[in-house]
């Protein structure tokens, strides 16, 4: 199944690149997004670009996907578990009320669910993770085709991993807050004489705080006996290298704008003598809409 998803994604990407090479003239695409019409409640029609820079407009994107997950949590097991990951992702973007049209407000929310098994197939992981991030990007338009942006996000995350094999300490919980550096590049092109785009966004955690028990410390000790010293850790790229890459292609299909995406979500930590990683690679499909407040 994963092979079919990868093959479909590569075919779609090849078609979009071929269409962009065949039609360099973007007469139907406005040079700057401020020229886009602002008198519509739903601007998902052919005359509008996938840009958040229209005043009073909010861009909303929903993506659903599946892929692979590699999970390690030495609090539960020294083995790395592999399995299937499912994701629902929502992304929003709009022009900020300040910044003279150069600043956009961005939000990204995701829910992961994974089912993984050990190399010996005698243990299973049930894993879930939620992330919510929001912040600002400063935007540049060096050419009519490109939009570049850089900024920062505040990200909150939480989740758990449950090991079906363990009788003592069968689960591990997670909770964290981090400041992230964020950047994106967006390329606009014509797809059969209609506006389309390719987009890449990278977010990386710079510093934050995270809950993690110490090695050998049980949840009974923490919450029943009150032995909670040292469970809150300061995080940085040295002990918690975490990054996310989201790439997508937005294509016009009749009156809709179909979105094909790939997400690489890498979360790692070494806190309190315990190691954890969650490496997720998912391929997604969904839609993008722009709503304009009249």
Regions found by a protein language model. Give the residues of each.
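Residues on the lipid-exposed face of transmembrane beta-strands in outer-membrane beta-barrel proteins
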Residues: 88-98, 132-138, 152, 181-187, ...
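Gram-negative (and chloroplast) outer-membrane scaffold detector with strong preference
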Residues: 101-162, 173-192
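Residues that define the transmembrane beta-barrel architecture of outer-membrane proteins
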Residues: 60, 82-88, 124-132, 146, ...
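Outer-membrane beta-barrel transmembrane domain signature
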Residues: 168-255
């Amino acid at each position: 199944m994963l092979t079919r998803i990868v093959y479909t994604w590569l075919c779609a990407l090849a078609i979009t690149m071929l269409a962009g090479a065949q039609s360099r003239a973007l007469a139907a695409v406005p040079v700057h997004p401020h020229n886009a019409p602002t008198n519509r409640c739903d601007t998902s029609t052919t005359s509008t670009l996938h840009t958040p820079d229209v005043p009073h407009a909010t861009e909303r994107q929903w993506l659903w996907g599946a892929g692979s997950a590699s999970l390690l949590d030495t609090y539960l097991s020294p083995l790395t578990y592999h399995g299937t990951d499912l994701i629902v992702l929502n992304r929003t973007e709009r022009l900020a009320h300040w910044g003279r049209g150069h600043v956009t407000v961005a939000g990204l929310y995701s829910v992961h669910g994974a089912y993984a098994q050990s190399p010996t197939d005698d243990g299973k992981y049930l894993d879930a993770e939620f992330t919510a991030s929001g912040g600002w990007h400063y935007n540049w338009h060096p050419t009519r085709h490109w939009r570049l942006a850089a900024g920062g996000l505040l990200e909150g995350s939480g989740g758990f991993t449950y090991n079906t094999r363990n009788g003592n300490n069968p689960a591990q919980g997670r909770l964290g807050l981090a400041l992230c550096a964020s950047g994106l590049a967006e390329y606009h092109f014509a797809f059969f004489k209609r506006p389309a785009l390719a987009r890449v966004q990278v977010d990386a955690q710079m510093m934050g705080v995270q809950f993690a028990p110490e090695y050998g410390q049980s949840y009974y000790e923490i919450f029943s006996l009150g032995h909670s010293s040292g469970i809150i850790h300061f995080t940085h790229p040295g002990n918690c290298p975490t990054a996310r890459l989201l790439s997508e292609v937005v294509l016009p299909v009749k009156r809709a704008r179909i979105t094909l995406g790939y997400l690489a979500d890498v979360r790692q930590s070494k806190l309190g003598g315990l190691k954890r990683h969650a490496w997720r690679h998912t391929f997604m499909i969904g839609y993008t809409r722009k709503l304009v407040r009249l």
